């Protein structure tokens, strides 16, 4: 909660600096939280911790826990897990507090597919594929960040012989996933597979325009898929009333 001279923007660089913290505030605070990393290594965490200790070290002795936020790419091949463990142990022992690390995208890095079917192909300055998937409903980060999701057998526009704009079947102007090129022409009924979708797809899904939620399947090591859950009209209705 921000008031007075404190910014209400949680991403503001001047949200709270150490000189703005009232001396009696710590009586009401059980822990501190920072979230400064995004797809970063343990060396960046080490740099952040040094800054936190320099600015807020005195308060760390008075609180019960420290949340180091997310953005730790723990499962990345070159991630220094030993350094992460060393830093967590050091903070715990130095300040006698509990340490939390948010799971973040690392737990599902490079995992998950969003399968979509080409419903129609229209021409409007560029050939456009109308999909049964939607950026607004199923991949909102595409519009919010913005972000260009990886597509199996898809390349940058004009890189390959056939370039298309990938759109959806909602009424939202701008519900466009992006422009991709392919080695071969795409036809109505073709399946396309967006990759690295386990992170921010299901947790952000919505039923805008009555667009259905995608079914969730689990693929085993042999490539066999089993249905975990399917969604229908009743799920849409119950979210509204």
Name each region found by the language model.
Residues 85-94:
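Alpha-helix-loop-beta-strand connector modules within alpha/beta enzyme cores
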Residues 21-29, 56-61:
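Acidic (Asp/Glu)-rich catalytic clusters
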Residues 28-38, 188-190:
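Internal alpha/beta core interface subdomains
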Residues 87, 103-241:
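Charged (often Lys/Glu-rich) extended helix/loop segments that serve as interaction or gating elements
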Residues 35-55, 128, 132-134, 155-156:
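Active-site pocket-lining/capping segments in soluble small-molecule metabolic enzymes
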Residues 11-13, 28-33, 63-67, 98-100, ...:
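Structural preference for beta-strand elements that scaffold enzyme active sites
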Residues 1-10:
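Single conserved hydrophobic/aromatic residue that forms the stacking wall/gate
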Residues 36-37, 66-75, 103-105:
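Glycine-rich beta-strand-to-loop/alpha-helix junction loops that act as flexible
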């Amino acid at each position: 909660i921000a008031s007075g001279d404190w910014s209400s923007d949680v991403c503001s660089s001047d949200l709270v600096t150490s000189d703005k913290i009232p001396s009696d505030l710590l009586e009401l605070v059980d822990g501190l939280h920072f979230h400064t990393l995004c797809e970063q290594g343990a060396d960046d965490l080490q740099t952040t911790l040094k800054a936190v200790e320099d600015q807020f070290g005195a308060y760390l002795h008075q609180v019960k826990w420290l949340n180091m936020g997310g953005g730790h790419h723990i499962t990345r091949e070159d991630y220094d897990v030993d350094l992460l463990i060393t830093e967590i142990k050091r903070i715990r022992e130095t300040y006698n507090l509990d340490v939390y690390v948010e799971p973040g995208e690392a737990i599902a890095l490079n995992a998950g597919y969003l399968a979509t079917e080409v419903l129609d192909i229209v021409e409007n300055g560029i050939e456009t594929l109308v999909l049964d998937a939607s950026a607004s409903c199923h991949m909102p980060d595409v519009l919010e960040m913005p972000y260009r999701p990886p597509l199996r057998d898809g390349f940058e526009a004009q890189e390959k012989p056939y370039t298309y704009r990938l759109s959806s079947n909602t009424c939202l102007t701008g519900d466009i996933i992006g422009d991709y090129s392919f080695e071969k022409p795409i036809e109505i009924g073709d399946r396309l597979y967006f990759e690295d979708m386990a992170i921010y797809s299901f947790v952000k899904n919505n039923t805008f325009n009555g667009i259905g939620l995608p079914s969730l399947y689990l693929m085993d090591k042999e490539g066999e898929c089993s249905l975990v859950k399917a969604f229908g009209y009743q799920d849409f209705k119950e979210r509204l009333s």
